[in-house]
Amino acid sequence: MSRYTGPSWKQSRRLGLSLTGTGKELARRNYVPGQHGPNNRSKLSEYGLQLAEKQKLRFSYGLGEKQFRNLFVQATKIKEGTLGFNFMVLLERRLDNVVYRLGLATTRRQARQFVNHGHILVDGKRVDIPSYRVDPGQVISVREKSMKVPAILEAVEATLGRPAFVSFDAEKLEGSLTRLPERDEINPEINEALVVEFYNKML
């Protein structure tokens, strides 16, 4: 299954989750597209609930199914902690996500584009792989030639707050993942146990 590239507003309504992080998609119509009002949502089966939760998490990070599943498999090999939380931490450590968390992009999709286009450095070296896994303490910065890219500057200016697990210097356009996030700091609307149950049946 390829990565979804359609309208994020319609997909957000289908999932009941803001994919842009603004919440605007759900402000007027918080029911799925095609429904005639919010009271016509059909009741989901156990499998349907698990699938829906998996899709919410997958679309939140903008990943294709194969890439998402492979990351879950990697999480199963981590000995400490719970599987669901370990999986979410791996998602958070993706370079495109860290760029988004730092406020260098307004959405994860935009952050992925910035990485792909070579605008982002890790410890002073250009990395154009969105799935690159960031370690705490590594410095994420904007390439000198890209420091005046309007979209990057606009994103930084529009960012009102950042998670406690990152630090950022707006003048230098650089920051870092200072530590791994705690569970209550990421995606509180996600029930990762349902995602684990879904893949336990599939793998």
UniProtKB/Swiss-Prot annotation:
HAMAP family linked to this entry: Ribosomal_uS4_B
Keyword rRNA-binding: yes
A GO term, aspect molecular function: structural constituent of ribosome
GO aspect biological process, one term: translation
Subunit architecture: Part of the 30S ribosomal subunit. Contacts protein S5. The interaction surface between S4 and S5 is involved in control of translational fidelity.
Protein name: Small ribosomal subunit protein uS4
UniProt domain S4 RNA-binding: residue ranges: 93-156
UniProt cross-references to SUPFAM superfamilies, sorted A to Z: Alpha-L RNA-binding motif
Protein keywords: Ribonucleoprotein, Ribosomal protein, RNA-binding, rRNA-binding
Role played: One of the primary rRNA binding proteins, it binds directly to 16S rRNA where it nucleates assembly of the body of the 30S subunit.
InterPro entries cross-referenced by the UniProt entry: Ribosomal_uS4, Ribosomal_uS4_bac-type, Ribosomal_uS4_CS, Ribosomal_uS4_N, S4_RNA-bd, S4_RNA-bd_sf
UniProt xrefs under SMART domains: Ribosomal_S4, S4
Any Pfam family: Ribosomal_S4
Gene that produces this protein: rpsD
Family statement: Belongs to the universal ribosomal protein uS4 family.
Phylogenetic placement of the source organism: Bacteria, Bacillati, Bacillota, Bacilli, Lactobacillales
Membrane-crossing residue ranges in chain numbering: none
Statement: the UniProt record of this protein carries the keyword Transferase: no
Gene Ontology CC: one annotated term: small ribosomal subunit
Organism of provenance: Streptococcus pyogenes serotype M1
